[in-house]
């Protein structure tokens, strides 16, 4: 005779339709009076009872467990839809791109509750064969934040992604700078193009692309203030960027930069050209007061600038336009100043860095430091010329 199950052990029966054993446990009633029943299924009695034990353990841990079919893709899509509210549009687009191209294809079909640290390690190791370390960190961050959000909403008990370190990836695209001869070739090739003024100002002031795209005419002073004491030369006030809220990258990025004569000349011409564009556009013109805008006054995005920049460089001698980006004009600015012996502290101020350490780290390939203070002082002390 079969042994009778103890009170509270729940039930166990064969489901003919599903062809599985179903183990059930009655946990009382919820606040609305509805009976709370937990179930576990399996091909054998033991498997069904073990599955029920897992469900009961999760319930005792206080977890409102997600449906068993809840996948990594579900968690990532939920995070993209609701977890990025209030973020900059560029951030949302970047996270969406990384998630849809790398996270979901690799791990999306995996059930979230079954995702293990080993799964994540293998996925990262595979991605390390093609992605740079920085890109690996970005895709790991997307997955980590998605699972963390799912855990906060009781979809999973723990976040295994946090247990996984990011491996070393492939070397990223190295930064580079124009030589003086290349810079001259770029400036000459840009003449007569819509990007001429942009390229001249970017190369000769070192302003960031995000700062130039947000530059407005009321922050451009082409005549300066010669009558004040001390006199102010022509300058631009770099106080805004296209970042969310219009703030510059850091507090010290807010700076006022004197304009070289070549910049003043091209900006006067650009101001006149933009006036003709405004007349040609007529009612289609959108007035934003931007120095650098589309043919109808609209703000430029990074893709617009990069495409037009490469188009302007296509006839530059010794330059493969497809290998260069607008941000490398800033690298070139640093390199040209360093070649002329401008102190690192001064370069750091001009590019809007919070300190020289940042400049050395970001532009270490462009900086050519020669620490000569000690040699100069010692020469003055001992007054001995070089041996002949």
Swiss-Prot record:
UniProt KW DNA-binding keyword: yes
Biological process according to GO: DNA integration; DNA recombination; establishment of integrated proviral latency; symbiont entry into host cell; viral genome integration into host DNA
Domain Tyr recombinase: residue ranges: 173-379
Active-site residue numbers: 208, 249, 330, 353, 363 (o-(3'-phospho-dna)-tyrosine intermediate)
One Pfam match: Phage_integrase
Keywords: DNA integration, DNA recombination, DNA-binding, Plasmid, Viral genome integration, Virus entry into host cell
Gene3D superfamilies from the UniProt entry: 1.10.150.130, Intergrase catalytic core
Molecular function terms, GO-annotated: DNA binding
InterPro entries: CB, DNA_brk_join_enz, Integrase-like_cat_sf, Integrase_catalytic, Integrase_recombinase_N, Phage_Integrase
UniProt keyword 4Fe-4S, yes or no: no
Domain Core-binding (CB) per the UniProt entry, residue ranges: 70-151
Role, per record: Required for integration of pSAM2.
Similarity remark: Belongs to the 'phage' integrase family.
Name by which UniProt lists this protein: Integrase
Organism expressing this protein natively: Streptomyces ambofaciens
């Amino acid at each position: 005779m079969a042994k009778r199950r103890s009170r509270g052990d729940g039930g166990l029966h064969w489901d003919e339709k599903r062809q599985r054993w179903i183990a059930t446990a009655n946990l009382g009633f919820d606040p609305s009076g509805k009976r709370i029943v937990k179930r576990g299924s399996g091909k054998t009695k033991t498997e069904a009872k073990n599955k029920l034990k897992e469900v009961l353990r999760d319930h005792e841990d206080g977890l409102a467990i997600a449906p068993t079919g809840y996948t990594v893709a579900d968690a990532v899509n939920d995070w993209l839809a609701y977890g990025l509210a209030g973020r900059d549009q560029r951030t949302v687009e970047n996270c969406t791109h990384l998630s849809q191209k790398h996270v979901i294809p690799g791990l999306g079909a995996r059930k979230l509750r079954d995702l293990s640290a080993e799964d994540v390690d293998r996925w990262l190791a595979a991605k390390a064969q093609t992605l740079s370390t920085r890109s690996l960190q970005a895709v790991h961050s997307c997955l980590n934040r998605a699972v963390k959000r799912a855990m906060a909403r009781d979809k999973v008990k723990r976040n295994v992604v946090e247990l996984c370190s990011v491996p070393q990836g492939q070397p990223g695209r190295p930064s580079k700078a124009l030589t003086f001869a290349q810079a001259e070739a770029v400036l000459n090739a840009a003449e007569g193009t819509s990007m001429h003024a942009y390229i001249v100002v970017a190369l000769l002031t070192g302003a960031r692309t995000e700062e130039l795209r947000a530059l407005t005419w009321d922050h451009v002073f082409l005549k300066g203030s010669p009558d004040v004491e001390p006199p102010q030369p022509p300058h631009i006030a770099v106080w805004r960027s296209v970042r969310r809220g219009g703030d510059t990258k850091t507090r010290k990025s807010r700076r006022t930069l004197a304009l070289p004569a070549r910049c003043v000349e091209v900006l006067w011409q650009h101001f006149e050209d933009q006036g003709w564009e405004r007349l040609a556009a007529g009612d289609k013109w959108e007035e934003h007061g931007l120095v650098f805008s589309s043919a109808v006054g609209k703000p430029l995005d990074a893709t617009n600038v990069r495409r037009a920049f490469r188009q302007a460089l296509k006839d530059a001698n010794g330059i493969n336009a497809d290998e260069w980006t607008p941000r490398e004009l800033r690298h070139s600015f640093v390199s040209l100043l360093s070649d002329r012996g401008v102190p690192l502290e001064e370069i750091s101020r001009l590019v809007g860095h919070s300190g020289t350490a940042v400049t050395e780290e970001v532009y270490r390939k462009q900086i050519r430091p020669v620490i000569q203070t000690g040699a100069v002082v010692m020469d003055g002390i001992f007054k001995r010329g070089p041996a002949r």
